[in-house]
Amino acid sequence: VSAAIMFDLGVVSCLEYLESIPWTEDEQEEVISLLEHLQIDDSATEVLLRVSSDPSTADRADDIFLNLLSGILQAKDDKARREMKALLSRLLKEDVSNDSSRLDVSKDTLYHLCHKCISSLLLCLSEATGSDEKLDRGAIISNITREADNIQWIVDILIGKKMSDEFVKIWAEQKELATLHSKVPTVYRHEISRITAQLCIGIGRGHILVPKEIRFSVLSTWLEALYEDFGWMRRASRAVDRKLIEDGLSQTILTLPLLQQQSVLLNWFDRFLNKGDDCPNIQKAFEIWWRRAFIRQYSAEPENSQLQITLSDYPS
């Protein structure tokens, strides 16, 4: 009103009032919109300082994100670490698709942190399998769990931003890590297998899109470890959703060529018979493979089927 009637003192008084009081987020949008609409001179600048970004912020944004994420990965207080993980996850996932000015964490920053965590995890496993008696075993085991959890968190962010395809390839290539993993007691290492489960869930839901060669490669490298750790995974944490993992693993297997499905599922069949509930129950995938292979066969050259099944006759 003061602006409309050219009452300058009234305008100044209103601006001083707005500058001195807190705003809710809704009020913030109203203030910005109002001042832009009225096109008041530089006197409005002071009011908007609390929401105005410095031009250099855009250039430094990725450094800020890197420092924040690194701080969480290295935090000493577990409770504070969990709270800040949840906070940053929520902020990074906020839907602001209509805001073209949004500054977001870069793919390079996230993958830099992934590589750093994998290197730390590799070092922890090397120390855990070593013979140096001077090392604090309890601290090493704690670090293994922590680094695995760190990777899960970064991968979750990557999946949310549809940037995780490259990580599947990286994880599939961790042959040395998988070898060391097999030498560490299950109770200490099962958090690592949750990374594999996380990727299978993402692939199974169609959130991670990678070529079939990479899908098979990640299973070739890590599926045995997931089988071995599955019992501990579901017993050690209420956060582990058995059905979610089994469905994700099933769908991932069923995206492979039929011969690879056969190889994976026949191996699972034998293991499940011996391990029972300590092995993922993916019999739905087995049923679908069975029907594809023997009932609803599709082949350009049916007479040249390459499927090979070996059956043993047991005496009755």
Segments the model singles out, each with a brief description of its role:
Residues V31-L35, A44-L48, I64-L69, M84-L88, ...:
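Generic structural signal of hydrophobic/aromatic residues within well-ordered alpha-helices
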Residues D156, Q174, A225, R235, ...:
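Enriched - but not universal
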Residues L35, Q39, D241-S316:
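Eukaryote-biased recognition of C-terminal alpha-helical segments
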Residues G71-L219, A225-D229, L244, G248:
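Extended alpha-helical solenoid scaffold regions that build the rod-like backbones
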Residues V1-M84, E94, N98-D99, L103-T109, ...:
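Post-BTB helical module
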